[in-house]
C-alpha cells in the first residue's frame, strides 16, 4: 500500500493505492496559505477518516506541478509517516522518451499520464486531461512522448466569463441536453458543454491527421466525468489515471 499524492493547480488528491488500484482518495483544495502543520493536520484526518494506520503505508509518493505546495506537503508527510516521501521526477524518474524541444518544459503530470496510459492501454495514444487546463498529449507507436496542446480548462473558462461580464451568471454544465438554449443560462451551458466537446473532437481529428496513426483516446481529469457523456468519438474514460500512474512509476523502479 502506498499513499499517492497528486498535487495540482486547483486540487490535490491523496489516494491509498494497492497493487496499482486506487482503494480510496480524498481531494483537497491546493491552498497556498496552508503551512506544513496545516497539511499535517489534513493528512492525519484522512488517515483517521479512512481508519488507516500509518504503519500500513509502505511509502508516500508525490507527483506535483506546484513546487511551493510540494515542499510543504513533502515535509508534512515526512513528519506524519516518519520517512521521506519519494517524488516523481526526482527520486523516481519517469521512464519515457520525450520528443519535446526542451524535455524539462513538460509538466510532470503529463508524462505520468503518458507512462500510465501506455502501461494500461498500449500505444499509440492521445491522452486528454480535463483539469485546470486541458492538455492533449500524444504517445507514438514506439511509446515515446511526442508533445501535445494546452487549452484553458472548463472551470477556468466559466470563471473568466462570469468575472468579466456584468450580467452573465455562473453556471453548472451537468445534464446539458440541447445545443440551442432557450434562456441565458441554457445558452451558456450549451456554449461551454458542446463547445468543449467540439474542441476535443476537433483536436483529436487534427492530431490523427497530422501524425498519421490510429491511436486509442484516453480521457481523464475532474471534468472528464461530464464531458465523456457527450463525446461522439471512441474513447476510454479513466478517472484515476494520474493517481494510479504514480503507483505505476513507483512499481517500475522495483518497489
Curated annotation (Swiss-Prot):
A monovalent cation. Ammonium or potassium. It is an enzyme of class 2 (transferase). Its EC number is 2.7.1.33. Its cofactor is NH4(+); K(+). K(+) binds at residue 129. It is found in: Cytoplasm. Its main location: cytoplasm. The active site is at 109 (proton acceptor). It catalyses: (R)-pantothenate + ATP = (R)-4'-phosphopantothenate + ADP + H(+). GO terms for cellular component: cytoplasm. Substrate binds at residues 100, 107-110, 184. GO terms for biological process: coenzyme A biosynthetic process. HAMAP family: Pantothen_kinase_3 (MF_01274). Catalyzes the phosphorylation of pantothenate (Pan), the first step in CoA biosynthesis. Belongs to the type III pantothenate kinase family. This is Type III pantothenate kinase.
